[in-house]
Regions:
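Hydrophobic alpha-helical membrane segments
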Residues: 1-303
Length: 303
């Protein structure tokens, strides 16, 4: 019997119902500690590149003056360092939330403290996300660099070269998605193998995902309906705020977005954790035993 997507999703919802504290509360803490906090910090820091771009579009200022005033080395360096720290912090928190959800999917009764698991192995957590970012970028450059060259030449060669450049950009985007799916299980391997290095986890993820990238992509698409429904509901709630003014629209939209994310996030991540357990271990760990699928041999076990 092969991977059963509806069953994996049903088990994720069942795990959410039986986990205490409720995953929605833990997800709320995660969202407050990660996206909300980092967005607040980012809003307090001036983006010199963004400001430079806006002033250039205005065409009322001399570019040399803009560079001298806005792109001050100290300001640029401070902005880049802060953005780097924010990115690393988001990676570490994402590692912790993945740890929490994997434990939830396995009925291990995780708690809020599992959100900090990334800080307990900060070197491995940071390195795995860094390597994934580097590898994904390098693979994308295989098409982006030729696309950039073709775009420059197309200024002299006509629309056909521009069309070719567009195809190369699309190919780069598709390749980036494929590469991202190759590495989707790397964090799970680190969580299951405390002695495994980041590069080894990425290698194991690539091997495990052979023949499974399409299945995981379809699983991700299966949540699209919920996202569309949420978008409609958020728009409806926001329209009700028109009665009270634009401030109410923003507040109601944020509340609707947050409420939906609190439910959908652990649901999606829990389903992915079940996908990992099936592909790598050949069963869903939420069950006390392998059940009727006990005889199934994971394709990954052949490696």
């Amino acid at each position: 019997m092969g991977y059963n997507r509806p069953e994996a999703k049903a088990l994720a919802k069942q795990a959410m119902r039986t986990t205490y504290p409720h995953p929605m509360l833990v997800t709320l803490v995660y969202l407050l500690l990660a996206p909300v906090l980092t967005n607040m910090v980012s809003s307090l820091v001036t983006n010199p590149f963004g400001a430079f771009y806006l002033y250039v579009l205005d065409r009322s200022y001399d570019i040399e003056d803009l560079i001298r005033v806005l792109l001050v080395p100290r300001t640029v360096a401070a902005f880049l360092v802060i953005q780097l720290l924010i990115t690393v912090y988001q990676w570490i928190m994402s590692f912790g939330y993945t740890s929490y959800v994997l434990r939830m999917a396995r009925n291990e009764q995780p708690n809020y403290w599992n959100l900090l698991d990334g800080f307990r192995t900060i070197g491995r957590a940071f390195l795995v996300y860094l390597l994934i970012y580097i590898f994904t970028t390098l693979w994308s450059l295989l098409f982006l660099v030729p696309a950039f060259i073709v775009m420059l030449v197309s200024a002299l060669g006509g629309p056909m070269l521009m069309f070719l450049a567009l195809l190369l950009v699309i190919a780069a985007a598709i390749l980036s998605v494929i590469v991202t799916y190759r590495y989707r299980l790397a964090v799970y391997f680190l969580l299951d193998n405390p002695d495994m290095g980041a590069l080894a986890a990425i290698t194991e993820s690539k091997r495990a995902m052979m023949g499974w990238k399409g299945e995981l992509f379809i699983q991700d698409l299966s949540f699209l309906g919920w996202s569309l429904l949420f978008g409609f509901a958020a728009a409806l709630v926001g329209s009700l705020g028109l009665i009270f003014g634009p401030g109410a629209v923003s507040l109601l939209t944020i509340l609707a977005t947050t409420a939906f994310s609190l439910w959908l996030t652990p649901y999606m991540w829990g389903t992915e954790a079940n996908f990992y357990d099936w592909v790598v271990h050949g069963r869903y760990s939420y069950r006390d035993s392998a059940g009727p699928d006990a005889g199934y041999q994971s394709p990954y076990s052949n490696f």
